[in-house]
């Protein structure tokens, strides 16, 4: 591994201090560095690495921008995923999809072919399971390619440190990098942030609450791997099956807590942060458990997730952020976020990850007579579109744009809460950042013949958290 990636792990204060200096320097990069896009051309080409549902959605968001951008290469480890995404995107965008067979790449090194199909000023989309994020980002930096990467971007301390180090190189090359934490591009939340901090409508922020309580989500719960002679598309090996069921495995997604709750955690930390600052909790404690370990048909689930989480995050000034997550059929659904201050409160996301209307209230009772402000229909925008608008504008006009440090810290904060619940310990953000356990340390070496990063026992069950018993690692 490169010496650059073996640097002494940073603590939280050093990172925040350093990142502040880097951001300050990058603000001058447009003056000091050459334009990143080809002179005389606004055409941006895009390569899609990871052709699942979110990958197809990100490519669609990219091609919906002015210009318009064109999709020129695709990569995945599953042929049927690539074919499905290609057909769907070709039907929708026709002439904007220019991906002949020789620019369709299959395999664990397929990302190299896709990125090599681009020129400087173009964009690689990374929407694979997060274990591969640093691998793909490193190669894009080497090739001088701009990036859009999906959240979360890390699931453990070692990959968080690695991504922060890699991003120093991306900044030095003036690369533009977007991260799929789209809440900060939602207009109603941008207006709410201003009303909280510039207008002081609810006073000092002291409490935040996020709830994502739904039924079965994604691939969070998995029955036993059916074996090599299975009837699934492509007859996947255990490694390939785990990739296809990525929500079930901490190495591939950070598990359900990380993948499903990162948006609320990110935008609530934003609501705590004054303009120009990025505040994150300093510690967390939490509880969680798995009530049901069988499918409705009575077959055992073997994944690594809990079905309920309740995490308390604490900020340096004592403010609290509570994040409650539940994946349970028949339970009351809740999918909202709230901010409480010394004078009143706010609804951040009324529904979903960041859907409005957002609103502010005097006091802490939600009522029409207490309402001070609510966002209007003009703010019912699409943040997935907005984040690409910002990225493509930065590329074409050489504006500073790099969301990786924030993406890493939002992902790390989410992992902090998950770790606290899985171990039943109070854990600091410094401890999480500097933890030595890496879920998939050889992600850059995986091939179709590789064993899966986490192995089942003789009965087909994967190692799961045991709070209070396993306290130094999550399993």
Predicted stretch roles:
Residues 22-96, 268, 471-475:
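N-terminal Rossmann-like dinucleotide-binding module
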Residues 92-126:
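A structured beta-alpha segment of the ubiquitous adenosine-cofactor-binding alpha/beta core
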Residues 42-45, 67-70, 100-102, 119-124, ...:
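Loop/turn elements at helix/coil->beta-strand transitions in domains of secreted/extracellular proteins
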Residues 50-55, 173-178, 183-303, 311, ...:
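Predominantly a Rossmann-like dinucleotide-binding segment in NAD(P)-dependent oxidoreductases
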Residues 130, 134-185:
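Beta-strand-loop-alpha-helix segment that lines the small-molecule cofactor/substrate pocket
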Residues 3-23:
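N-terminal secretory signal peptides and thylakoid transit peptides that target proteins
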Residues 61, 68-75, 89, 280-475:
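Glycine-enriched catalytic-core subsegment of oxygenase/oxidase enzymes
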